[in-house]
A protein has these predicted regions:
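Short, polar/acidic, helix-capping and beta-turn segments at strand->helix junctions
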Residues: 1-95
Length: 95
């Protein structure tokens, strides 16, 4: 689980970098709306939400209350490039 949480943190940092590239600054983020996480896992692994806590906890640490979000945690048998975690997110930004 700990390695998965580290992978989730790395994935969310990548998403934050994409936000900076798109809007110029994380200061424009007014709310993290949703995080959708996919965990590359075997058939006997059931702790997908615990893995995604790595990403969710980082968002709350970084953004405070506006970092709280809805979340989906799904286990899958494979991900592109055999990555451990893939994340998409919905973010509200201000002008």
């Amino acid at each position: 689980v700990e390695e998965g949480q580290a992978a989730a943190r790395a994935a969310i940092l990548n998403r934050l970098a994409v936000i900076v590239q798109a809007v110029g600054s994380l200061e424009k983020v007014s709310r993290i709306v949703a995080v959708n996480g996919f965990v590359n896992a075997g058939p006997d692994f059931y702790d997908h939400p615990k893995v995604l806590n790595g990403a969710s906890d980082l968002l709350v640490e970084a953004f405070g209350e506006i970092g709280r979000h809805s979340r989906t945690a799904v286990g899958v048998s494979a991900l592109p490039l055999n990555v451990a975690v893939e994340i998409s997110m919905v973010v509200e930004v201000r002008d």
